[in-house]
């Protein structure tokens, strides 16, 4: 009996890993162009900005670099987000199981508080994968024109490791965790809440939801993720596009980074690039969740 239970838990974990990876690929291809615009707007100079807004950044990027410019740094999240989403869905599933076992009613489904707690725990695991992936991606995305320091994502990772070692690779980890822990609590909480609402409205089980309904719930999760934690993402991106060599950095740590952003730009500085990010959050996360759920159903 114990062996069967272990086999069942292992299969659930494997499904989360495979389905999460598939969802991650869909999320990258759908959302990366707007992510590039977001990072460029977040990290451009305050005194001499290159772009006046989202559309200006889009036009100039395509004009100067072609459509390929929108996919700069895509290799890092394509590999990294596949791994990250595998970790995310696995950690979320295992966290739900753990919280359920520790609850007063282990045989009952988790309430919203339990689901958001599971999302927060998953955010801790994700942060350690997310930090280096976002670092390589962001360093690549801010390169413009032909004057590129890095030839490829692999070259970027190699140079950062050579100059900064482990600390260099995990530059911005603190800010990543500050973002990822509450963000994933909101992300999964909103997704589960919306999914349950749509199922109860039509008097069906969540497994009977249509692809469009799953996409709607995924989009709601994405909006929740970014709306509440975007300022932390600005700090993270600013730190991760700073110099890798410690003596050349503008910011000592995330507190110093946040205080300098506020001093130079006010509250508005924490919302640079929010428009493309908000637009991206719906289709990218809709694609992620529908592919995850459908892949899981096929494997079942």
From Swiss-Prot:
PROSITE patterns: SOLCAR. Keywords: Membrane, Mitochondrion, Mitochondrion inner membrane, Repeat, Transmembrane, Transmembrane helix, Transport. The gene is mcfG. This is Mitochondrial substrate carrier family protein G. Induction: Up-regulated by phagocytic stimuli. Pfam families: Mito_carr. Residues 1-9, 94-115, 191-211, 293-300 are mitochondrial intermembrane. Mitochondrial solute carriers shuttle metabolites, nucleotides, and cofactors through the mitochondrial inner membrane. Mediates the transport of acylcarnitines of different length across the mitochondrial inner membrane from the cytosol to the mitochondrial matrix for their oxidation by the mitochondrial fatty acid-oxidation pathway. The keyword Phosphoprotein does not apply. GO terms for cellular component: mitochondrial inner membrane. Belongs to the mitochondrial carrier (TC 2.A.29) family. The chain crosses the membrane at residues 10-30, 73-93, 116-136, 169-190, 212-232, 273-292. GO terms for molecular function: transmembrane transporter activity. Residues 31-72, 137-168, 233-272 are mitochondrial matrix. PANTHER family: MITOCHONDRIAL BASIC AMINO ACIDS TRANSPORTER-RELATED (PTHR45624), MITOCHONDRIAL SUBSTRATE CARRIER FAMILY PROTEIN G (PTHR45624:SF24). It is a multi-pass membrane protein. Solcar repeats lie at residues 11-98, 110-197, 209-298. It is found in: Mitochondrion inner membrane. It comes from the Eukaryota.
């Amino acid at each position: 009996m114990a062996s069967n239970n272990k086999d069942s838990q292992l299969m659930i974990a494997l499904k989360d890993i495979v389905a999460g990876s598939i969802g991650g690929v869909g999320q990258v291809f759908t959302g990366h162009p707007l992510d590039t615009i977001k990072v460029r707007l977040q990290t451009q100079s305050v005194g001499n900005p290159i772009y006046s807004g989202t559309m200006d950044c889009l036009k100039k990027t395509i004009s100067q670099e072609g459509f390929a410019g929108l996919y700069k740094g895509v290799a890092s999240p394509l590999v990294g987000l596949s791994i990250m989403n595998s970790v995310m869905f696995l950690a979320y599933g295992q966290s739900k199981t753990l919280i359920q076992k520790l609850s007063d009613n282990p045989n009952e489904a988790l309430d919203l508080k339990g689901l958001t707690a599971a999302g927060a725990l998953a955010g801790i695991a994700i942060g350690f994968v997310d930090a280096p992936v976002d670092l390589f991606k962001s360093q690549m995305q801010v390169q413009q024109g032909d004057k590129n320091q890095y030839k490829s994502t692999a070259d970027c990772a190699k140079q950062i490791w050579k100059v900064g070692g482990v600390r260099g690779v995990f530059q911005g980890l603190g800010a990543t965790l500050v973002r990822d822990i509450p963000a994933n609590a909101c992300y999964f909480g909103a997704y589960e809440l919306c999914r349950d609402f749509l199922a109860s409205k039509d008097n069906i089980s969540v497994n009977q939801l249509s692809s469009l309904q799953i996409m709607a719930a995924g989009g709601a999760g994405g909006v929740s993720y970014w709306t509440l934690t975007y300022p932390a993402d600005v700090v993270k991106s600013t730190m991760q596009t700073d110099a890798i060599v410690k003596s050349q950095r503008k910011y000592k740590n995330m507190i110093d980074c946040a205080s300098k952003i506020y001093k130079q730009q006010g509250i508005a500085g924490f919302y640079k690039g929010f428009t493309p990010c908000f637009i991206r959050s719906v289709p990218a996360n809709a694609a992620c969740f529908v592919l995850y759920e459908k892949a899981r159903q096929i494997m079942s």
